[in-house]
């Protein structure tokens, strides 16, 4: 086998360059610069890092960025009031509420308060419902990033057996739906799935989205499989035992440098789409 590395870092830079050019063109036409508002509640160190990365990414493409920092003791009502103000602000195109929020916050209520046309992170129940019905909306960033990687490398998933390991509402479930829209035959697995190794062995495409280091073992994987690892665990380890499995694969994403960079690139891309007043194009 001569496995091909799916270079998310390279593709993300290509996407960001296209965004940068689009913003420059908007400037020449005296159009408003797209703007992303990010809300950080509390002092979670990992969240601080992720938010700073998103702010930096906005600046790198010439996009406006507003970071709203709220105290750990913020109530759900106070957070909803902040989201309402951003919803009504015509200069804000996208709203991102950094997950996780403190335990005292009703996070689902906060996510669902985000206006559909500003839900550039694809986290609202309404966005998820539209995705499930094949209706245009904004998509969860990590799954859509994986779809763009597949398309960039000319991988046609139609008719292939795809196994998604993990069923979170922002990763596993939407990825399964997107692959279904692309005419793959999808099996969605989780902690209660029986005979998981046998199911994975029959897969042409394997998506690691379970959040457990090297949970998907190399000896579960058939020769020529396509491996997309959305996991990122301490020690730069993904959910798939990539180091042992990649030589038998046809395509694979590295960790880091595969799926991760695509997540932020898609966030910026969907913010640009919002500024242009249209949803993300269909994945087919």
From Swiss-Prot:
Subunit structure, interactors included: Homodimer.
Species of origin: Leptospira interrogans serogroup Icterohaemorrhagiae serovar Lai (strain 56601)
Binding site for NADP(+): 166-168, 191
PANTHER family: C-1-TETRAHYDROFOLATE SYNTHASE, CYTOPLASMIC, C-1-TETRAHYDROFOLATE SYNTHASE, CYTOPLASMIC-RELATED
Gene that this polypeptide is encoded by: folD
Family of this protein: Belongs to the tetrahydrofolate dehydrogenase/cyclohydrolase family.
EC number, as in UniProt: 1.5.1.5, 3.5.4.9
Entries under Pfam families matching the protein: THF_DHG_CYH, THF_DHG_CYH_C
Keyword terms: Amino-acid biosynthesis, Histidine biosynthesis, Hydrolase, Methionine biosynthesis, Multifunctional enzyme, NADP, One-carbon metabolism, Oxidoreductase, Purine biosynthesis
Matching InterPro entries: Aminoacid_DH-like_N_sf (IPR046346), NAD(P)-bd_dom_sf (IPR036291), THF_DH/CycHdrlase (IPR000672), THF_DH/CycHdrlase_cat_dom (IPR020630), THF_DH/CycHdrlase_CS (IPR020867), THF_DH/CycHdrlase_NAD-bd_dom (IPR020631)
Catalysis: reaction(s): (6R)-5,10-methylene-5,6,7,8-tetrahydrofolate + NADP(+) = (6R)-5,10-methenyltetrahydrofolate + NADPH; (6R)-5,10-methenyltetrahydrofolate + H2O = (6R)-10-formyltetrahydrofolate + H(+)
Full protein name: Bifunctional protein FolD
Pathway where it operates: One-carbon metabolism; tetrahydrofolate interconversion
GO MF annotation terms: methenyltetrahydrofolate cyclohydrolase activity; methylenetetrahydrofolate dehydrogenase (NADP+) activity
GO cellular component, one term: cytosol
Keyword Oxidoreductase attributed: yes
Its job: Catalyzes the oxidation of 5,10-methylenetetrahydrofolate to 5,10-methenyltetrahydrofolate and then the hydrolysis of 5,10-methenyltetrahydrofolate to 10-formyltetrahydrofolate.
Single GO BP term: L-histidine biosynthetic process
């Amino acid at each position: 086998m001569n496995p091909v590395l799916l270079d998310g870092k390279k593709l993300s830079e290509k996407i960001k360059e296209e965004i940068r050019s689009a913003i420059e063109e908007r400037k020449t036409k005296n159009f408003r610069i797209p703007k992303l508002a990010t809300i950080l509640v509390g002092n979670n160190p990992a969240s601080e890092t992720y938010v700073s990365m998103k702010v930096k990414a906005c600046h790198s493409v010439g996009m406006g960025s507003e970071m709203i920092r709220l105290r750990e003791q913020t109530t759900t009502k106070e957070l909803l009031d902040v989201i309402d103000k951003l919803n009504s602000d015509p200069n804000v195109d996208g709203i991102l509420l950094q997950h996780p929020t403190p335990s005292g916050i009703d996070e689902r209520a906060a996510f669902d308060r985000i206006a559909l046309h500003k839900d550039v992170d694809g986290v609202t129940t309404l966005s998820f419902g539209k995705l499930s019905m094949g209706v245009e909306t904004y998509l969860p960033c990590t799954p859509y990033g994986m779809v763009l990687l597949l398309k960039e490398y000319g991988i046609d998933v139609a008719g292939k057996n795809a196994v998604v390991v993990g069923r979170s509402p922002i990763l596993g479930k939407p990825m399964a739906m997107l692959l279904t829209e692309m005419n793959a035959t999808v099996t969605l697995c989780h902690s209660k799935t029986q005979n998981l190794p046998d199911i994975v062995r029959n897969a042409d495409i394997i998506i690691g989205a379970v959040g457990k280091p090297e949970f998907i073992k190399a000896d579960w994987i058939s020769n020529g499989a396509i491996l997309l690892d959305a996991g990122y665990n301490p020690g730069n380890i993904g959910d798939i035992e990539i180091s042992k499995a990649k030589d038998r694969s046809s395509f694979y994403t590295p960790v880091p440098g595969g799926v991760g960079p695509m997540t932020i690139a898609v966030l910026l891309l969907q913010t640009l789409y919002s500024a242009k007043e249209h949803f993300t194009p269909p994945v087919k």
